[in-house]
Amino acid sequence: MSDINTARLPLSSPMLLPCVGDDILMV
């Protein structure tokens, strides 16, 4: 799942950045 979040990071807007960032930090 982390791979999907990482791939979405550049595609998603900065608004989702903090949400995805939290997931990456947890992993």
Curated annotation (Swiss-Prot):
Protein name (database record): MSDIN-like toxin proprotein 7
Transmembrane segments: none
Propeptide: 1-10, 19-27
Cross-link (Cyclopeptide (Leu-Pro)): 11-18
Functional note: Probable toxin that belongs to the MSDIN-like toxin family responsible for a large number of food poisoning cases and deaths.
InterPro entries to which the protein is assigned, alphabetical: Amanitin/phalloidin
GO molecular function: toxin activity
Family to which the UniProt record says this protein belongs: Belongs to the MSDIN fungal toxin family.
Post-translational modification: Processed by the macrocyclase-peptidase enzyme POPB to yield a toxic cyclic octapeptide. POPB first removes 10 residues from the N-terminus. Conformational trapping of the remaining peptide forces the enzyme to release this intermediate rather than proceed to macrocyclization. The enzyme rebinds the remaining peptide in a different conformation and catalyzes macrocyclization of the N-terminal 8 residues.
Keywords: Toxin
